[in-house]
Amino acid sequence: GKAVVLEYLPNGQRMVYDQNYVTNFYLTENVPYAPVRGKDRYDLIEQTLIFKKGVMSEAEVMALLAVIGQPETEEATSMTQWSVVYNLTDLTGRVAVVREYDNVFRFSLDGMIQP
């Protein structure tokens, strides 16, 4: 399978990046008024994938997402809302909501719910 990141920039331009992971910052450089919060988490994902030579199990990826997840704040807007691991081979996904990494929902990308 193929994964991309699609960015809608403030000037209306759309950018597409061949990328298998993303955190909440723009990959496009020099976007006016764009926060860079999340870049450190993005870099940790990238370094881990380089170290693992791009091969990780779903459990390893979810564990990495647990490490980089943002804890709850008073505003409850900056915390990690969800983490998703997609398996592009068998077209399934795993979702952890509000950092509950021990309570993962499984689903199929073809619409069938997995047990």
Predicted regions and their residues:
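C-terminal, well-structured catalytic/ligand-binding subdomain of enzymes
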Residues: G1-P115
